[in-house]
Amino acid sequence: MSEKLQKVLARAGHGSRRELEALIRAGRVSVNGKVAVLGERLEDDNAVVRIDGHVVSVKAQEEVICRVLAYYKPEGELCTRHDPEGRRTVFDRLPKIRGSRWISVGRLDANTSGLLLFTTDGELANRLMHPSRQVEREYLVRVFGDVTEEKVRNLVRGVQLEDGMARFEDVMYAGGEGINHTFYVVINEGRNREVRRLWESQGTTVSRLKRVRYGDIFLDKKLPRGGWMELDLKQVNYLRELVELRPEKETVLNMAPDAATRKRERTRSQKIRRAVRRHEERISATPGRSGKAPARRKPGGESSTRNKVANQQQSSRKPRG
């Protein structure tokens, strides 16, 4: 075996390549007692690899089932495993698993809510995040200020940001009142605060941002804020095939569409909602944990506007079919 250390560790389920590269740069990874350096290759299958002083396996997770969670991130949560200030993170409410850990597929900034995927497969996470894959991300965005046809044309054609050209693949008007307007926008990369910066380049302020789709995976309307659901085999294999990974043959979910299964699903959903409420109550009562949990929205109300364009303002570009 002669592969880069971060690739071997990612395949073994210890994180995404990006996370592991950061650990190596920080001097937290060693090989046979020596601190590893970025770009180092693992030549020996029997090498002793440690992360933060703990010996870790470098064997590929071939026999481990790939799992993917869809999580409804609330505003205010951080996309980090641990926060030194004790603020809430997206990992706080995820289910515990043995022998592996959840890896986030990209990030959402603290003020952004919506769909965030997690997987146990580091290679899947890395490939989905890589810019070359051009995976679409769709957001529901509320902006404050006047939005002209010229501004929309600029956003679709592309504008120069500090880190290069950027553009929306699609812009669709979804309604609004006064100087508050709502749009669905699509991008195919995950640069830091890209949606907000694109709007800001046109002198328009984003007042609310929510991710509603990643590839063909949509945020489930029945999922509460702070809740999660595990993707079924078809959805998992859609993501794997999207980035040219072999499909899985089984899942940890029982997908039999019978009455008993539906009852279990309802029970599971109720348990998730109760767990979310308990977590929020516990956080609110814990000293040193800042911020209140976001207020719950009533279900529905968004999707009905999705295919309608308000009469008072028309987007200059029709959504793609």
From Swiss-Prot:
Transmembrane segments: none annotated. Gene3D superfamilies: Pseudouridine synthase, RNA-binding S4 domain. GO terms for molecular function: 23S rRNA pseudouridine(2605) synthase activity; RNA binding. The keyword RNA-binding applies. Its EC number is 5.4.99.22. Residues 302-321 have a biased composition (Polar residues). Keywords: Isomerase, RNA-binding, rRNA processing. GO terms for biological process: enzyme-directed rRNA pseudouridine synthesis. InterPro entries: PsdUridine_synth_cat_dom_sf (IPR020103), PsdUridine_synth_RsuA/RluA (IPR006145), PsdUridine_synth_RsuA/RluB/E/F (IPR000748), PsdUridine_synth_RsuA/RluB_CS (IPR018496), RsuA_PseudoU_synthase (IPR050343), S4_RNA-bd (IPR002942), S4_RNA-bd_sf (IPR036986). SMART domains: S4. Residues 263-277 have a biased composition (Basic residues). It comes from the Bacteria. It catalyses: uridine(2605) in 23S rRNA = pseudouridine(2605) in 23S rRNA. It is an enzyme of class 5 (isomerase). Residues 3-68 form the S4 RNA-binding domain. Responsible for synthesis of pseudouridine from uracil-2605 in 23S ribosomal RNA. Belongs to the pseudouridine synthase RsuA family. This is Ribosomal large subunit pseudouridine synthase B. The gene is rluB.
